[in-house]
Amino acid sequence: MTKIPEGYRSSLSLYDTQKAIEQVKNVFLTKLCAALKLSRVTAPLIVDPLTGMNDNLNGVEHPVAFDLPNVGKDAEVVQSLAKWKRYALWRYNFAVGRGLICDMNAIRRDEQPDNLHSIYVDQWDWERIITQDERNTDTLEDAVCRIVEAICGTLDELKWHYPQLNTQLSREVTFVTSQELEDLYPTQTPKQREDLFVREHPTTFIVGIGAALNSGQPHDFRSPDYDDWSLNGDLLFWDETLDCAVEISSMGIRVDAETLKSQLTIAGCKDRLKLPFHKMLINGELPFTIGGGIGQSRLCMLLLEKAHVGEVQASIWDKQTEERCAEAGVSLL
């Protein structure tokens, strides 16, 4: 449900908003590629469901699918490129320590639109090859800190061009496990835990998402066939405009063969082992990797002090969202 903060007014005009979005995307991409040694590649919009390349997200979302009568196959619009990227690193013969980045545009038909969520998803999807010995928390934390520095550096340049922006971000990252959050706030929901913790620690990375906690429930659901649930997490910043924690990136070290089999068993999805992608992983053909997605619209919202994702991207909205934004003077693109 959309809720516009009382008294909210955009710091930028529609024209300046569009110019600032362009600057955010260009500057951040340059900084991120330098920080993580990434090269841009072209990504697919649709994939063949029989390959197992699409992201199953939480396992309940239905990808947009349609038939291709002149090709003789079915197609799915990507929900993310988590598995495709790992395959692409192998196919394009990337070296250890190097990675790729691409613009991911997705349609998530089951998404519940609100201030932060849209049917249309745009993010930077990145993936980098690591060694087996680098499958550890040090590697994960190093990548997180590099991403945070790229974000804060982008904000510094943005505020030089638009001094009316008051966004403040902390470069100091607090790392906390999802179990530690549950122990701190056992009676709160995962979202409430995030808000309570990130309010006090404005740049936070929550480690370990997907596996069941001591309560028997995971902090959040993750597909079992790309992230290692013990070596992944979410990067959140405190958003003063919305007065809540905002997830900017979901990322992690990817599953190896044993972790894949274990997580698929836990999730009751062992049938996926028959798919081409999963067979390649089990057979040791795919490289060890770390990767993630960074929300383009989310980042623009955060840096430009926007109250609704529709102020920085064009999509289709429900009637309630359109009415509330109109009443508050919020211009949806």
What are these regions (language model features)?
Residues 102-188, 192:
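Extended, charged alpha-beta segments that form solvent-exposed binding/catalytic grooves
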Residues 32-40, 147-158, 307:
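A generic secondary-structure signal for well-formed alpha-helical elements
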Residues 48-54, 168-176, 318:
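N-terminal pre-domains immediately preceding structured catalytic cores
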